[in-house]
């Protein structure tokens, strides 16, 4: 027997040596590329065989030795909390080879783990999933209820529009400029709002739907280990990973349902006491925007016309024009005074004035009462220009009237001293001219600038005469009509 064993061993050694020699001969005959490939194959075989061999040796405990089994279970219990990095089922090695984990644990480093080490550790499983804690809060549920688009907007084809866009579109449809008789828009009672009962019913329906949806979401999250952060109605911890928390950017004002913002601010506007018939007639089942009460355009026009017809309008014109009379306007003033004096001194104009005053005494009285400049021009000019805000006769008269007082400082510097003194004493000069009519004529050749004084004095005389006749006319003929 020993000889046979020895012979077999020697034969095996010879065959192995022959095999090795044959392989070496083949490698020498092969090209360098093929040699490299064979080397790689051998290395791979070695690795695989070592790994499987080690696993087989570690797992093959003898059934008789109970102590070895106890030690293996202890090792598995110690390794479980360390190696099980996630709650998912993808760490298959830890479940199939618990003894391997003990060996891995002994090979791991004992120092404190840093981020770089945990990322680059060789014994770490390839996939690690983040634990996501999902919480459905009451705020989230209420926000989702209020952000739900209504059935009316779905019928109108704007299901996916935001509340702000719907408000804007409805604002364009219900423009506030309506031609109402009283000058205001439709009153708040005629505007269509949802009553409280309809609103409550709709909210109850939406809350029921929301409860069902949130229950479904919760059950899905419990069954599946990881849910995406874009699930509706759920606020997760990893939503703010993009830089800013979306919940802080949320603008929440009262109720988010479109059309209820103004009734919340002004609760008296929402009519709660409407009956069913009125609600059906006025169409309260639809949303409507509550516009603020604004006057209509015809009412604004009427207000402005009434404002312009007030008795202070002419005086306002005077004040407005007086602001412009700062510079040199002597040429315009002389033209205006000549025109007025020509109109007033015309005999035909005087006769016309008398006829008008005799036929219509109330017109002359009104003209004198409401118009401070009525003595300066004829009544037909007033009647023709009554629709205007400020007639040309008004303007020319007020320009002449303003400059009858002391002239500007430029005029005083330009004129000589006697002329300036004469112009400064203008109230007394009127009476002096009435007593001595030859004084302006004698002063004319003395200075070239005295023509302005001559014209103004002539205009003053004419206005004095017309004022006297105008005030006498109604008194002479009024007893006949009374």
From Swiss-Prot:
Region ranges (Disordered): 198-247, 413-482
Record key words, sorted: Isopeptide bond, Phosphoprotein, Ubl conjugation
GO cellular component, one term: nucleus
Listed Polar residues bias regions: 439-450
Record's compositionally biased regions (Basic and acidic residues): 198-214
Compositional bias ranges of the Low complexity kind: 220-230, 456-469
Protein name per Swiss-Prot or TrEMBL: G patch domain-containing protein 2-like
Species assigned in the record: Homo sapiens (Human)
